[in-house]
């Protein structure tokens, strides 16, 4: 006997977010999830696993507040920035009444999280330069409680212009929260809007330890906001969101030595990104390599499925973005080690475009 008649209708209709791990693959070079390619060297410092953890462990909160340049009371730590996306929806959106707004092509969890909670989704596609269409957004703001903007944007890799973000804050004042997803900001920290929190009470920032901190497996993220927002989020967060081992390693990552290691990784990845970008520009099967300030590159291929399968068959796994608006024949390539980048370049230099007579 099926139990589907007991399930919520919107969950039955839900198309789940397909993470890199759910999509799977058999490879030895994983360039599909924007992870750091090598594990960091943190170890557990042990103890007291018989006790429940603190809801908001002081060492983690204080460490991240100091790193981000905010007060501890402006920080919530959660199970990845994905949980931050959900906490905001749970705290601010009424199912069946309110909506969120986002601007594809962008990160898929804004849509999935809203649909899971029965919140309407409004989209305003980005312009051809992947900047925001302010006029179109203004026309769709009625009933919107949360606007999610990813900067640097995943998967395109570009920053949203600061003047555009400021215009969005003025536009949403008194109407909605503007949530700036800065999951990749550690690769370009000068572009953060964290210093604007004092000026805009409706600004919210999402952060993570998954990217530059090389801790994707830890599932540790942060919401930065003004105290009034933080207090509401603490009403709906789980009582023990961070396991003791997670808090232990996160605190180590936010130490002076942990921050030094993170900045070394950022410099390495930024250098490897330029190496990969220059190498791909010379590959006949690559039509465009788009500028990026993050730990991945978006490339347009001739055609994407052939480039994807060629690398897949050789054990290198990328992320196909072709179904996103405006990204036909586009693949996203995570920046790996120098050797991994050179391997991708070597394979693709030998691959002719489908339009080439030599490839027939």
From Swiss-Prot:
GO molecular function list: histidinol-phosphate transaminase activity; pyridoxal phosphate binding
Pathway entry: Amino-acid biosynthesis; L-histidine biosynthesis; L-histidine from 5-phospho-alpha-D-ribose 1-diphosphate: step 7/9
EC numbers, comma separated: 2.6.1.9
InterPro entries noted in UniProt: Aminotrans_II_pyridoxalP_BS, Aminotransferase_I/II_large, HisP_aminotrans, PyrdxlP-dep_Trfase, PyrdxlP-dep_Trfase_major, PyrdxlP-dep_Trfase_small
CDD domains registered for this protein in UniProt: AAT_like (cd00609)
BP GO annotations: L-histidine biosynthetic process
Top-level lineage group: Bacteria
PROSITE patterns linked: AA_TRANSFER_CLASS_2 (PS00599)
Modified residues (N6-(pyridoxal phosphate)lysine): 211
Catalytic activity: L-histidinol phosphate + 2-oxoglutarate = 3-(imidazol-4-yl)-2-oxopropyl phosphate + L-glutamate
Entry cofactors: pyridoxal 5'-phosphate
Keywords, alphabetical: Amino-acid biosynthesis, Aminotransferase, Histidine biosynthesis, Pyridoxal phosphate, Transferase
A Pfam family that the UniProt record links to this protein: Aminotran_1_2
PANTHER family listed in its UniProt record: HISTIDINOL-PHOSPHATE AMINOTRANSFERASE, HISTIDINOL-PHOSPHATE AMINOTRANSFERASE-RELATED
Annotated NCBIfam families: hisC
Self-association state and partner proteins as the record states: Homodimer.
The family this protein is said to belong to: Belongs to the class-II pyridoxal-phosphate-dependent aminotransferase family. Histidinol-phosphate aminotransferase subfamily.
The protein, known as: Histidinol-phosphate aminotransferase
Organism (species): Sodalis glossinidius (strain morsitans)
